[in-house]
Structures are given as C-alpha cells and as structure tokens.
C-alpha cells in the first residue's frame, strides 16, 4: 500500500472503532435485562477495553501517518516509537487473545461467556465487530508495515502489568457486587480461577512472541537505535 492509502486505511479503521466505542455502550441502556452489562462501566469487560485500545492505537497510527507527510520522519520519532510500543505490547496481543478465548469458550459452551439472551439485544454484526473483525485488523497491521519490538523483558513486563491490572479490576468487581464479570468464573473453584488467570497470561505472552515472529518473518530484523553511553 502507498503512504496515502495506508493513511486513509488507518483513518477509516479509526472511525470504525470510534463508532463502536460510542454505539455499543448505548445498546439496551434502559433495559432491565442489561442492567448488569451496563453497571460498572466498560472497564470490567476486556472486550470493550480492547475496542477502546484499538481506537487509541489507530488514532496514533493515523497521527503518525499525517505527521510523517507534514514534518518528516525524523522529527516524529517519539510518535512512531509510541505507536510501535502500543501495537506490539497491547493492541495485537490483546485483540488476538479476545478473539481466540471468546470463540473457544463460545463454541464450547456459549453460556460461559455470551449467554444466548444477549442475542435479543446485540445483533450478530455487533458480536462479530467486538470479537471477530478485531483479529484480521490486527493481523493485517502486522503485514502492512514493520513494527519495532521492544526487548522481550520490557514487552512481557508491560503486557503482564496490563494483565495484572485487569485481574485486580475483575476481583474488585466481585468483592463489590458478589458477581463475576464473566459467567465462566462461576463454574470454577478458587484454584481453577488461579489456573485460568495463569493460563491466560501464558497464552497472551505466547501471542506477543508470535507477533514478534510474524514481524521478523515479514520484515526481517529491524535495527533498534543504539543507546548512547555516558
């Protein structure tokens, strides 16, 4: 894709995610059956957090595209570095994780993650917008342009910090209300929940490393700026 086409693509995807972030929280806002869905805000659902994260990433990517055309590549290194860090450590791993875990649980027993009653309020296209299209958008981004990956230590630490923060959010929600964010946790013992959270981090860390492999396969080694010695 040309630079102009890439810029237009990022702009269109950004607007798609802006629309989803506005539209989905409005669905069934006054419906009693969806009170639990709306109570507590979007931060309790990884799916909705991911949509917000994707909007932020594509916003930064769009800004990076525009600034490169206006003031040049060398003058916006911070924006480009932030774009790459955001994509490699969060946007790609988390969107892929949501896609894989949701559809695995959905096909095993949808009541564990997306009860059938939600179909009365969320059309199929909304479900796929939240849980399906997020993956091809992220995968396409990996082959659209090279991304400079941080060190594995830094990348996995940042990903782990996000994972830990979200676990705290889930547990805090349970302490406050006595209800789990996702029905799957109702069927697990305390040990099972610990194993689930541990397996989730192992999976998302594996996705991070897989994304790094794809980046290397498509673009080869990307030289990192050398740190100046004092």
UniProtKB/Swiss-Prot annotation:
Catalytic activity: 9-hexadecanoyloxy-octadecanoate + H2O = 9-hydroxy-octadecanoate + hexadecanoate + H(+); 12-hexadecanoyloxy-octadecanoate + H2O = 12-hydroxyoctadecanoate + hexadecanoate + H(+); 9-(9Z-hexadecenoyloxy)-octadecanoate + H2O = (9Z)-hexadecenoate + 9-hydroxy-octadecanoate + H(+); 12-(9Z-hexadecenoyloxy)-octadecanoate + H2O = 12-hydroxyoctadecanoate + (9Z)-hexadecenoate + H(+)
PANTHER family: ANDROGEN-DEPENDENT TFPI-REGULATING PROTEIN (PTHR10989:SF17), ANDROGEN-INDUCED PROTEIN 1-RELATED (PTHR10989)
Gene Ontology molecular-function annotations: hydrolase activity
Described function: Hydrolyzes bioactive fatty-acid esters of hydroxy-fatty acids (FAHFAs), but not other major classes of lipids. Shows a preference for FAHFAs with branching distal from the carboxylate head group of the lipids. Regulates the expression and the cell-associated anticoagulant activity of the inhibitor TFPI in endothelial cells (in vitro).
The keyword Cell membrane belongs to this UniProt entry's keyword annotation: yes
Assigned GO CC terms: caveola; cell surface
Site residues, Important for catalytic activity: 47, 131
Subcellular location as annotated: Cell membrane
Similarity field: Belongs to the AIG1 family.
Transmembrane segments: 8-28, 46-66, 86-106, 121-141, 155-175, 191-211
Gene that produces this protein: Adtrp
UniProt GO BP: cell migration involved in sprouting angiogenesis; cellular response to oxidised low-density lipoprotein particle stimulus; cellular response to steroid hormone stimulus; long-chain fatty acid catabolic process; negative regulation of blood coagulation; negative regulation of extracellular matrix constituent secretion; negative regulation of leukocyte cell-cell adhesion; negative regulation of lymphocyte migration
EC number of this enzyme: 3.1.-.-
Topology of the protein relative to the lipid bilayer: Multi-pass membrane protein
Protein name: Androgen-dependent TFPI-regulating protein
Keywords: Cell membrane, Hydrolase, Lipid metabolism, Membrane, Transmembrane, Transmembrane helix
Residues in the Extracellular compartment per record: 29-45, 107-120, 176-190
Domain of life, per lineage: Eukaryota
